[in-house]
From Swiss-Prot:
Coiled coil: none annotated. SUPFAM superfamilies: L35p-like. Belongs to the bacterial ribosomal protein bL35 family. This is Large ribosomal subunit protein bL35. One of its GO terms (molecular function) is structural constituent of ribosome. GO terms for cellular component: cytosolic large ribosomal subunit. GO terms for biological process: translation. The gene is rpmI. Keywords: Ribonucleoprotein, Ribosomal protein. The keyword Cell division does not apply. InterPro entries: Ribosomal_bL35, Ribosomal_bL35-like, Ribosomal_bL35_CS, Ribosomal_bL35_sf. The keyword Ribosomal protein applies.
Length: 65
């Protein structure tokens, strides 16, 4: 059986934790930042865990990570 190709954009955007959860960066942090508070921008710097509904799809896209 052939190997599954890894989805290129997904391998750059997602990491798997030791327990198998999918770690991702938060959105809304690239531009139009002047109207956002410092607290909001600081919290957007942190990573978060993807929802379980999305995680199952993401794991199929990055099978060897």
């Amino acid at each position: 059986m052939p190997k599954i190709k890894t989805h290129s954009s997904s391998k750059k955007r997602f990491k798997l934790t030791g327990t198998g959860k999918v770690k991702r960066a938060k959105a809304y942090k690239s531009h139009i930042l002047t109207k956002k508070t410092s607290k909001r921008k600081r919290n957007l710097r942190k990573s978060t865990i993807a929802s379980s509904a999305n995680a199952s799809v993401i794991k199929k896209l990055i099978p060897y990570k």
